[in-house]
């Protein structure tokens, strides 16, 4: 049996906190059409992401990728920013 890896999820968001060492909090927003009311709904979620170089500050747009657990709450890595 071959070892086939699933592609990792990639999300784009905005850094809302960079106070912790080597960690940034990224807010990811998504829009979807409500199935009953047919209205577009905007939902946001916060992710703790690993920033090993403390390179990103609040307001930066970044991409995060899924990874192995780094700590209790961190399972995402910052891959690049604008």
Swiss-Prot record:
One of the primary rRNA binding proteins, it binds specifically to the 5'-end of 16S ribosomal RNA. InterPro entries: NA-bd_OB-fold (IPR012340), Ribosomal_uS17 (IPR000266), Ribosomal_uS17_bact/chlr (IPR019984), Ribosomal_uS17_CS (IPR019979). Keywords: Ribonucleoprotein, Ribosomal protein, RNA-binding, rRNA-binding. GO terms for biological process: translation. It comes from the Bacteria. Belongs to the universal ribosomal protein uS17 family. Part of the 30S ribosomal subunit. It holds the Pfam family Ribosomal_S17. GO terms for molecular function: rRNA binding; structural constituent of ribosome. One of its GO terms (cellular component) is cytosolic small ribosomal subunit. This is Small ribosomal subunit protein uS17. It comes from Rickettsia felis (strain ATCC VR-1525 / URRWXCal2) (Rickettsia azadi).
């Amino acid at each position: 049996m071959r070892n086939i890896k699933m592609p990792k999820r990639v999300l784009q968001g905005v850094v809302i906190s960079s106070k912790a060492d080597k960690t940034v909090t990224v807010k990811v927003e998504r829009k979807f059409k409500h199935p009953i009311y047919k209205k577009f709904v905007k939902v946001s979620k916060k992710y703790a992401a690993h920033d090993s170089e403390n390179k990103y500050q609040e307001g930066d747009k970044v991409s995060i990728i899924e990874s192995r657990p780094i700590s209790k709450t961190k399972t995402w890595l910052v891959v690049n920013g604008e």
